[in-house]
Amino acid sequence: MTKIIVGAGITGLYLAYKLIKYKDINPNDILIIEKSDRVGGRIYTYQNKGYKYDVGAGRLGKKQKLVMRLIKEFNLTDKIYDITGDKNYFIDNKLLNEKELLKYYDSKFSSISKLWKYVIDYKSNLDLTKMNFHNYVSTFLSTNEVKILDRSLGYVNEIYRLNAYDAIYTLKKDFDVEDNSFFILMGGLSIIYEKIYEFLKEKNVKIILNCDLLDIDDKNKTIKTNKENYKYSELYLAICKKGYMTIPYFNNHKELLDSVSVGNLLRIYAKYDVKKNKWIKDIKKTLTDNKLQFIIPIDNKSGLIQISYTDDYIANFWNVLTTKQIKINLVKYLKEIFPNENVTEPEWITKHYWCCGAHFWKVGKNSRKIQKQIEKTFKPKKIYVIGEIYSSRQAWIEGSLETVEKLLK
């Protein structure tokens, strides 16, 4: 009988790989359906004008055990390229390094990581699920210390949307607030899913693209898609929240499944003429309080840069602009940071918007209880909810892989 996996992102591919390699499942008994026209989901290495760059998932952490294991398994260790932790901060029209940022906010902490360590280790009697991270830290830190946290993390979703309990957990596990060492993979992160995809193709696993799940009939163990109906013995769902909110089968479970919010993300890559834009030569990763949010250097010598990485309402700001309007605004916001430098419009840009870039446990929701409730509701029907969406490490590949490992234990 067929095990159907819905979603050919890293979660679905990893599950199929594990079922075949470690659970001795016959590859002919696995069917993967994917609503888009490509595999890989939110891992996407884009190719443009001779350049390759990641426009979806951007980085991995050495503390992420499952990711590290996968890299070793596919002999990709030599592709690891460490990211420097050195950053600048553009705050109130001032470009500051870490020491200057701490001094600007009159901090009693000697480093940002020491402030984060204090926050993560702080013991509180409050119910952290009932407030967002910003409100939680405001109960025991000064206004200025809270501003340092806000400015040094930079994300809207993690600070204002995610509940504080899950924010602390993921900050501790996955962010570079406590010297977590991050890296990218040379040639792009897509190599991870491509290796799994190659394995599945060699095993002749059937993968159907442009195949959208429309409904589920758990009595007859059948799924309805835009192509045809398929019978399953077990159904694995690696889909985003929109699927759970629109598929009729889940209508009676909306309150349970609506416990996460959807975080949108947007990356803008730009290629500059380095002779006319001297500012690009020594630019570091820069967190800004203007609409650029994050500036992430890619190749300073050639002039390729991720000129803006944004989330939430800031991502929406850029997404509605035309290419010309984006170029004009890039000049405007860069001139704020480099008022004495010549800043031209980029030669070209590419914009990459993810309406479901990540998911975040809502304020007032107890993630651990909800995870158990989801399992209790669907597991008896041989339906399994997996992926980053309801994981303990949302917005990270590691969260997706953890849900697969937990399922197969």
Residue ranges, per PLM feature:
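Conserved flavin/dinucleotide-binding core of flavoenzymes
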Residues: 14, 282, 289-409
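Central helical "cap/lid" subdomain
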Residues: 218-223, 228-280
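Beta1/beta-strand and adjacent pyrophosphate-binding region of the FAD-binding site
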Residues: 1-11
